Swiss-Prot record:
One of its GO terms (cellular component) is side of membrane. Keywords: Cell membrane, Glycoprotein, GPI-anchor, Lipoprotein, Membrane, Signal. Belongs to the UPF0277 family. This is Uncharacterized GPI-anchored protein At5g19240. Glycans are attached at N45, N73, N102, N135. It comes from Arabidopsis thaliana. A lipid is attached at S169 (GPI-anchor amidated serine).
Amino acid sequence: MAISKLHLVLFLLSVFLSLHRPVLSNTDGENLLFTVFNQYRESVNLTNLKKNKNAECLADEVVDQLQNQPCTNTTGSASVPGTDPGIPNFPNLLAKCRLNTNVTRDGLILQVCAPKHHSTPDLSSFANVLTKNLNDSKFTGAGVGIDSDGIWLVTVLTTNTPGGSYSNSGAFAFGVNGLVSSSLMFLHVLSHNSLSLFS
């Protein structure tokens, strides 16, 4: 009997979240999960996702924020690209990773928790959303975050478009640093010209 790809992903996620807690470090778990994502994409003839450091930063920040929230069987969600992901303090989390909404609006943030007392958590709804989006060729990169207790998992999917690249925005950098630098340079030139006028 053939096993469906959805069941394969569901099984792998269940095993991963059930077994990794006492054995794997967060980094090992994130790397393993990333490998599972790419094996799945290869099985449906899609290119591998590339690791995106900024998406990983954001996933880690979201996980840190979720870490103290209670986890139930129904906890978890997926953002809709182009909308506010509904994560408290989201603008602050973006700023910590030197990102802004212009470079994240086409991406997707998936979050799920697996209660510690469940040996095989029910991840079917998360697996359905994850599988649907892993099948989407517009997603080209990812970042994964897992909390230190192994309860929360956040996956950030990125695109290769300006609106979903999760790249450190040059406009953002110029917006703050460039404005200050330009203002200081303008004041310097103005003061230099003022001094030469009075000499």
